[in-house]
């Protein structure tokens, strides 16, 4: 009993989600064929022999059943990284995060210390005339800068048009290779990315090729999209050791009526709801209303925290990548199968040379592997 209590207490300590990883296992490029990435299949939380490590993403065709509902995140990564020039020709990099008001946008800056309030910037491109920007303020929460863009850049659509002309895909810092920008523009997007607004990819979806999606549909698997625009908070380190009162970033989520009605229908059958990626989990669980004890369509910012002790209302299974230590994504997956079990699986993955992080391999947490609801 004492051991169990200690383990539960550790579930709320950030250091309990740390692990050692050989840097050589951090993937710098994706599998040449999306569905040929390696796949760890977790079937039962307590039986080691039920963890399969000799599979590939294409084997999901054998895992999903006719009538199962698979939810994908159709967000599209914006070319949100901009290179700007100060009056003295010093180059600064901006990462556009979100609109604040009017034509003012919150951006991370590197190096930020050079961007004092009222400092003038110039967005340079060989494709068009220079665009003038101004530092409008400092954001205390992120350390970012509020940047005033031209007066017509007042919505996501107009910003995305500008970024398509001037920007670059904002890759995570651990992806270091010499590939051309055009390579990442394709490989760092899912095959079904249609809704621009993310600053990072929903990476579990990178494993789904067009042919795998087609074969799943032919089998009778229902595939529907939701939208969660992956924000800066997804890769922002957790800065508190005590997780009992953890607060996380807000992200824009849209789950439409069709998806909600399908969730309600599936819940009355023996079929399962499988989320492709942790972003899909966060979106789906956010559409459950505790006030009316039912699922509702949503289109709003959500700040749902999923950590050990959370009771899942929607999701039965999950396809996910291998995540960074001490990350909110690790907390979410731990809520599904338990922290100790997850870290044991990560040790196994490291031993068997699985590739980690955004361009890495995948883990499928099957419905029978989830912790029993209390």
UniProtKB/Swiss-Prot annotation:
Q: Which GO terms describe its biological process?
A: queuosine biosynthetic process; tRNA wobble guanine modification
Name the InterPro entries on file: QueA (IPR003699), QueA_dom1 (IPR042118), QueA_dom2 (IPR042119), QueA_sf (IPR036100)
**Which pairs of positions does the record mark as disulfide bonds?**
none
* Keyword Cytoplasm appears in the UniProt entry: yes
Give GO cellular component annotations, separated by semicolons: cytoplasm
Q: Show the catalytic activity.
A: 7-aminomethyl-7-carbaguanosine(34) in tRNA + S-adenosyl-L-methionine = epoxyqueuosine(34) in tRNA + adenine + L-methionine + 2 H(+)
Taxonomically, the superkingdom here is Bacteria
Q: Which SUPFAM superfamilies match?
A: QueA-like
Q: What class of enzyme is it?
A: transferase
Q: Which GO molecular function annotations are given, in alphabetical order? A: S-adenosylmethionine:tRNA ribosyltransferase-isomerase activity
A UniProt-annotated Pfam family: Queuosine_synth
**What does the UniProt keyword field contain?**
Cytoplasm, Queuosine biosynthesis, S-adenosyl-L-methionine, Transferase
Q: Kindly tell me the pathway this chain contributes to.
A: tRNA modification; tRNA-queuosine biosynthesis
Q: Where in the cell is it found?
A: Cytoplasm
Segments crossing the lipid bilayer: none
- What's its EC? 2.4.99.17
UniProt similarity note: Belongs to the QueA family.
Q: What does this protein do?
A: Transfers and isomerizes the ribose moiety from AdoMet to the 7-aminomethyl group of 7-deazaguanine (preQ1-tRNA) to give epoxyqueuosine (oQ-tRNA).
Q: HAMAP family given for it? A: QueA
- Note the subunit structure: Monomer.
User: Which named protein is this?
Assistant: S-adenosylmethionine:tRNA ribosyltransferase-isomerase
Name the encoding gene, please. queA
